C-alpha cells in the first residue's frame, strides 16, 4: 500500500503546516436508517494525540506527513491518493483508494 498526494495538496501542506491526515469512520444509527461513511480531514496536534493515544489509531509515515488510520479493517487499493478540494475557499481532503 502506497500513499500519494497531489501537487496541490503537497503545496497546501507546506504552506499551512497541516501535515497530519485523519481517516475516520462516521456512523449514523437511527431507528430507520444506518449509515457508515469515511471522513478524511486534517488533524491538529491535539486531535492527533487523542486519536493515537485514546482511540488507538495507527500512524503511517509518508513523504508528505502522517496518515492516521483506524484499527478496524478497511479495504485499501494498491495506491491511495489524497487530493485537495476547495469549496467557497474552504479546504478539505479527498481520498481515492480506501473503502469500508
Where are these regions (language model features)?
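Domain-level signature for proteins that mediate thiol-based redox and metal-cofactor handling
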Residues: 1-29, 33-100
Amino acid at each position: 500500500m502506497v500513499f500519494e498526494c497531489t501537487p496541490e495538496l503537497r503545496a497546501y501542506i507546506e504552506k499551512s503546516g497541516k501535515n497530519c491526515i485523519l481517516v475516520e469512520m462516521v456512523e449514523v444509527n437511527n431507528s430507520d436508517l444506518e449509515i457508515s461513511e469515511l471522513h478524511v480531514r486534517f488533524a491538529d496536534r491535539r486531535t492527533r494525540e487523542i486519536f493515537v493515544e485514546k482511540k488507538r489509531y495507527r500512524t503511517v509515515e509518508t513523504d508528505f506527513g502522517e496518515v492516521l488510520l483506524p484499527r478496524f479493517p478497511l479495504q485499501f487499493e494498491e495506491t491511495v491518493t489524497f487530493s485537495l478540494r476547495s469549496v467557497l475557499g474552504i479546504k478539505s481532503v479527498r481520498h481515492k483508494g480506501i473503502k469500508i
